[in-house]
Amino acid sequence: MQALLLVGAGGAAGAVARYLLGVQALRWLGPGWPYGTFAANILGGFLMGLLAGGLAHRGGAGQETWRLLLGVGALGGFTTFSAYSLEVALMIERRAYGQAFAYSLGSVALAVAALFAGLLLARRVFA
């Protein structure tokens, strides 16, 4: 139960932070490109790396609490791209270059394809 509360609280905070970033990016830079999403994905990757490195260095008690609150919750709510980035980085560190390339390309291509499939289905169902 405590794990669910940590993930939920972190996820709520991350989602609000992403929303506010998107609002500010739109206000500052305009609607010409998805600046908010781009920034959230890059910042989320950076923060996930910082968290993973910090937790690996620190170790010990409380590590799982911080991982759940910040890694799974806050960064998961801010962007799932941060978790994806960590997974690719771990593959590269293990020298699994082919796997990292396939996962990177496949994740992006299939996510975009799935989005289009969902749009197509929604348009047919709700037309």
Swiss-Prot record:
Na(+) binds at G76, T79. One of its GO terms (molecular function) is fluoride channel activity. The chain crosses the membrane at residues 3-23, 36-56, 72-92, 101-121. Fluoride-specific ion channel. Important for reducing fluoride concentration in the cell, thus reducing its toxicity. Belongs to the fluoride channel Fluc/FEX (TC 1.A.43) family. PANTHER family: FLUORIDE EXPORT PROTEIN 1-RELATED (PTHR28259:SF1). It is found in: Cell inner membrane. It catalyses: fluoride(in) = fluoride(out). It holds the Pfam family CRCB. Na(+) is not transported, but it plays an essential structural role and its presence is essential for fluoride channel function. The keyword Cytoplasm does not apply. GO terms for biological process: cellular detoxification of fluoride. It is a multi-pass membrane protein. This is Fluoride-specific ion channel FluC. One of its GO terms (cellular component) is plasma membrane. HAMAP family: FluC (MF_00454). NCBIfam families: crcB, PRK14195.1. Keywords: Cell inner membrane, Cell membrane, Ion channel, Ion transport, Membrane, Metal-binding, Sodium, Transmembrane, Transmembrane helix, Transport.
